[in-house]
A protein has these predicted regions:
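Conserved active-site tyrosine of GNAT-family acetyltransferases
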Residues: 68-72, 221-223, 227
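Conserved donor-binding loop and adjoining core beta-sheet/short helix segment
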Residues: 1-51, 55-60, 159-180
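Long, contiguous binding/interaction regions
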Residues: 210
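Short amphipathic alpha-helix that is part of the acyltransferase structural core
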Residues: 96-128
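Short acidic/polar active-site loop segments enriched in Thr and Asp
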Residues: 52, 205, 228
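Conserved acetyl-CoA-binding loop-helix of GNAT-fold acetyltransferases
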Residues: 32-44, 178, 184-201, 220-224
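Acyl-donor-binding surface of acyltransferase catalytic domains
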Residues: 34-99, 233-238
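A conserved beta-strand-loop-helix scaffold within acyl/acetyltransferase catalytic domains
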Residues: 13, 127-178
């Protein structure tokens, strides 16, 4: 198997105008030589594309952890942060009555959804970059997964529930964001449960979530909704 084939099969790759994120996607065991070739290839591609930052994310439970660490140092990557991975069984999640109203992107309009997404996630990307991210992560049907949440006429958040590519029953929330002025007003739990029910409706039996270890707000949401800690990941970056 070529280096690019290994990357496409065993890693999740996300690109935007200034960076590439390469994330370990399973527990495949590689030889040291294979990992060296993967690192060399990624650095060479980043230099060729003249991007600013190359990110690499590895699991703390990876069978290749020590070798990854060795070659991340060899190729001048610097440690950035740690994320925690949680899991929730959603077989028994039920639709509960709530004042939160979910609407699809076709009901609110693409411009409105994109504006809310920018405001609530604070990610500085163009609309074309946003669409490209959706296509990479979800595919051509991405619009069917983009939801706004409102109470009355007041938008409180956006969420993008979907089934992980290559996994039949693994539910993900590409984004779960609440407007800063609507946080800590008692909406988070009902919003999260509503998102879990949507995942169940589209075929997920469990949810896997990932957040930065310093994100106390989202950690609190996970804890209140019975999510269990699975593992952690470490993120490294090489700047060009």
């Amino acid at each position: 198997m070529t280096t690019i084939e290994q990357l496409e099969k065993h890693f999740k790759i996300r690109r935007n105008a200034s960076s590439i994120m390469i994330k370990e996607n399973n527990a495949e065991i590689f030889t040291e030589e294979q990992i060296k070739e993967i690192m060399q290839y990624c650095v060479a591609e980043a230099e060729k594309e003249e991007i600013e930052n190359l990110h690499f994310e590895i699991s703390s439970k990876s069978p290749n952890y020590d070798v990854y660490k060795k070659y991340l140092e060899t190729y001048s990557f610097e440690y950035v942060t740690e994320n925690m991975i949680v899991c929730k069984d959603i077989y028994e999640v039920e639709d509960v009555e709530s004042e939160i109203d979910f609407k699809l992107i076709e009901e609110v309009g693409e411009d409105t959804f994109y504006s809310l997404w920018n405001e609530m996630t604070e990610e500085q990307v163009t609309y074309d970059q946003f669409v490209n991210m959706m296509l990479q992560e979800i595919g051509e049907q991405w619009k069917e997964h983009c939801l706004t949440a409102s109470v009355g006429e007041e938008p409180i958040g956006i969420v993008i529930p979907h089934i992980e590519k290559g996994a039949l029953e693994e539910g993900k929330l590409m984004y779960f964001a609440v407007a800063p002025n609507m946080r800590n007003k008692g909406y988070e739990t009902a919003f999260f449960i509503g998102a879990m029910f949507v995942l169940k409706e589209i075929g997920a039996s469990y949810y896997i979530g990932e957040i930065n270890v310093q994100n106390e707000w989202m950690k609190d949401v996970f804890e209140k909704n019975g999510c269990q800690l699975l593992s952690s990941t470490e993120r490294y970056v090489r700047k060009f």
